[in-house]
Structures are given as structure tokens and as C-alpha cells.
């Protein structure tokens, strides 16, 4: 099986063309491939499949390192767009794809950045899903013998965002896994720790569902900005500083889609016998 290794701000991926190759990934195979000592090593596996709708170009599938399939990965979407152009699967700059729960438009810019229309953030608890009676800007949760104030949103996948004073000292490794599997998140969640530097700039670390802390989480950056705007903390255009680098997020508010712009890097091509 041929594959490519790619990354978006250090969030790394194994990307596989299932348009011209016949491949099948079991959870056990994915876990073995994800092993950084015995396999390829990655945060997520991205699979390019033929479209199910003639109006679309591709179907986009995402698997976490633990073998679970998820519906959204923002950094992966940028790498997906670069991959299909690099491999000659399309020469379009505006690439229309379906995911497990919707559709996306990926735009490759002249400077090789990728702009992703992430759709409109959804704050309805049932959409996340999150156990709550109604939409609130801030929810109170109990975890690890602490009272946590957080925002909750779906970007096509579930996110919980906590504001912290200093992201460098945030309890990502201890609080992240506890909140990820909290009973109020029946499908688990990605946990973002956000430091507001100013209205146009935040620092962010994300403990990803099924992957742990990563160098960058695109949908997590989108979720943090959406929650920050909902809570009146942020402007419509925000620079998000992650451990792996910078993303630019723009959202005009309810009724509008949210846009993420950032890099996607091809590292190498490989071949593995399954």
C-alpha cells in the first residue's frame, strides 16, 4: 500500500489514496500503523475515497490513532487538499468533499496555504453531544475534584473549551483525559485550553479525543475562537498560536460559516506491506 506522511503544524497524518488503491482498515491495523516505534506513526489516518455524490470531488474519512473513526479534523482537511493535488487526483483549487456528517469546501491558495470552510459552529448541546438542558455561553462542570467553567461547541466533532491564565502551565495532561471521557460527553470530546492574549490573538493547547495532546488541532482552534466570540472575548478574526504553529480563524457570528487558514506540509511518500 502506498501512502504519504504529512503534517499540519506538527499534527501528523498518514494519508492513503483509496481512489486508485483497494484498501481496508480495521481498528487493529490502524493501531499498529499508528505505533511510532513499530509502525508509521501518526495522530490520525486520512483516507481519500471516491465521492458518493456526483456534485462532490471526494469523500474524506478520518481515523484516530486508537482506531476510532471521527467526523472532523481541520488540520487533516488541509493536508487532504494538498494530497489530492500533489497526487494528481484533481487539479481544482476549490475541492468539495463529504465527511461522516456533512460537506466541506477546501481551497488551496496561491501561496500554498489551505482555507477550509468549516461550516457554522453548532452550540446546541444535542449536536455536540453534551448533556445539558439548554444552550449556555458557559457551563459548570465537576471534574478531578475541581469546578470547571467551559464552553461547548460542535465543529462537526465535540469540543470543550476552558479559558486559562497561562497555557504553558495548564493541566492539559491531567485534566484533559478526565474531561475527554466525562459522563456529560457521551461520545467523548476534544478539550481545549485557551489563553486570551488579546481580542485578535489566543494561545491554545488541545487534548484530542483518541489521540491525546497534539502539536495542533485545527477544529480545536476553530472551536476555541467560536466559543471566545460567543462569550464576547474575541474579535471576528483571530490568530491562534498552537505548539506547532499558527492558524488564522475568521467567523462573523451566527448564520455564517467559520473559516480556517493554515499550512499543510508533505513530508515523504512510502510503501508498506500489510
Swiss-Prot record:
Coiled coil: none annotated. SUPFAM superfamilies: Diaminopimelate epimerase-like. The keyword rRNA-binding does not apply. Its EC number is 5.1.1.7. Keywords: Amino-acid biosynthesis, Cytoplasm, Isomerase, Lysine biosynthesis. Transmembrane segments: none annotated. This is Diaminopimelate epimerase. It comes from Escherichia coli O6:H1 (strain CFT073 / ATCC 700928 / UPEC).
Amino acid at each position: 500500500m502506498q501512502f504519504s506522511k504529512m503534517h499540519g503544524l506538527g499534527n501528523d497524518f498518514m494519508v492513503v489514496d483509496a481512489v486508485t488503491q483497494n484498501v481496508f482498515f480495521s481498528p487493529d491495523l490502524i493501531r499498529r500503523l499508528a505505533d511510532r516505534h513499530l509502525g508509521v506513526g501518526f495522530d490520525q489516518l486520512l483516507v481519500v475515497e471516491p465521492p458518493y455524490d456526483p456534485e462532490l470531488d471526494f469523500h474524506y474519512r478520518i481515523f484516530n490513532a486508537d482506531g476510532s473513526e471521527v467526523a472532523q479534523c481541520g488540520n487533516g482537511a488541509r493536508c487532504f487538499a494538498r494530497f489530492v493535488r500533489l497526487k494528481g487526483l484533481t487539479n481544482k483549487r476549490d475541492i468539495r468533499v463529504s465527511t461522516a456528517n456533512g460537506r466541506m469546501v477546501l481551497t488551496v491558495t496561491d501561496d500554498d496555504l489551505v482555507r477550509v470552510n468549516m461550516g457554522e459552529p453548532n452550540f446546541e448541546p444535542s449536536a455536540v453531544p453534551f448533556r445539558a438542558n439548554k444552550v449556555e455561553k458557559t457551563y459548570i462542570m465537576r471534574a478531578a475534584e475541581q469546578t470547571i467553567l467551559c464552553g461547548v461547541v460542535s465543529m462537526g466533532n465535540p469540543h470543550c473549551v476552558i479559558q486559562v491564565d497561562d497555557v504553558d502551565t495548564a493541566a492539559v495532561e491531567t485534566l484533559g483525559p478526565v474531561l475527554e471521557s466525562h459522563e456529560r460527553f457521551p461520545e467523548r470530546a476534544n478539550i481545549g485550553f485557551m489563553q486570551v492574549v488579546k481580542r485578535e490573538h489566543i494561545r491554545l493547547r488541545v487534548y484530542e479525543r483518541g489521540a491525546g495532546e497534539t502539536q495542533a488541532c485545527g477544529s480545536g482552534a476553530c472551536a476555541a475562537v467560536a466559543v471566545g466570540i460567543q462569550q464576547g472575548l474575541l474579535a471576528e478574526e483571530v490568530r491562534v498560536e498552537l505548539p506547532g504553529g499558527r492558524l488564522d480563524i475568521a467567523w462573523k457570528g451566527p448564520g455564517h460559516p467559520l473559516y480556517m487558514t493554515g499550512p499543510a506540509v508533505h513530508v515523504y511518500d512510502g510503501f508498506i506491506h500489510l
